[in-house]
Amino acid sequence: MVTAGALVLVLFLAPFPTASLWSGGGYSTRAALVRSLSSGFVLFWDGGIGVVSPNLIVPVDFWMRFHVVKAILAAALVVVLARLGSRTWTAYTSATTAARKVAAGMLAAATAVLGMVALLILVANLQGAIAPLSSALGLLPMGTPDPALAGTVSQVRHDLATGVGSPALAVLVHDFSAYHVAMAGIGALTTAGLLATAVFLWRRRRRLTAGRQPGRQLLASVAVAAVAFAAFFAVVTAANLSTSAHPAPALLGFFEGGG
């Protein structure tokens, strides 16, 4: 439990400074990253040739490293929580008093919830690591009075709304599509994994004797939760597949929503 708690703290505190330690440079604060990204995005758009210049590559690469670090930590947390869940199950089934059984059951429920949150964080950061440009666009302060960024965002909106093509816009649309293709693939794998987990738990439940009703109920509850989570990811997968097939309208909605 201590390891899991420590990993939770590291997961939220370590990615930004750790990403700064890698080759390619870093940023002292998130505000510095946003300023670099904003100016790089304006220069990229004004260039008009669809080539991502170093001014934009540097902050986007940093954001990719941030996602990689966070994904690794989230994956480690998922593994630790899975092992903790196994030990909690053993404690639950071997508890000799009602108080111990209740405590183990509550810990098992908390572990399952935290595991689902860790899985969500893992999936989101894998997506960001695969398509960091589109992920980084979410950092742009589109609602701020910065005239250069505001003008660029206005042009992007206009071109997306009117269908005016440009090399720079083509890069944005292509990466936005890749961003959603990545989530569709990750979501499909996650859905399959959760369904397999539910089947495993249900079969394990069936092997328990009728006299171990509390254990059967706990396994059934976790299996049902896994199925519900799988259904959620199935919907996410379908939505991202749809967006990847028609990325321009969704990208327009993104830029309009940010302003």
Predicted feature descriptions by range:
Residues V2-G24, V79-T88, L114, A118-L119:
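Polytopic transmembrane helical bundles with strong interfacial aromatic enrichment
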Residues Q217-G259:
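A cross-kingdom marker for long, charged
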Residues G5-V8, A108-A124, V153-R157, A228-F232:
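Alpha-helical transmembrane segments of multi-pass integral membrane proteins
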Residues F16, S20, V79-M106, L122-P132, ...:
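Cytoplasmic membrane-interface segments at the C-terminal ends of transmembrane helices
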Residues M1-L9, W22-G25, A99-G115, P214-A226:
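Alpha-helical transmembrane segments and their helix-start/interface "positive-inside/aromatic belt" motifs
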Residues V42-A103:
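N-terminal extramembrane/targeting module of integral membrane proteins
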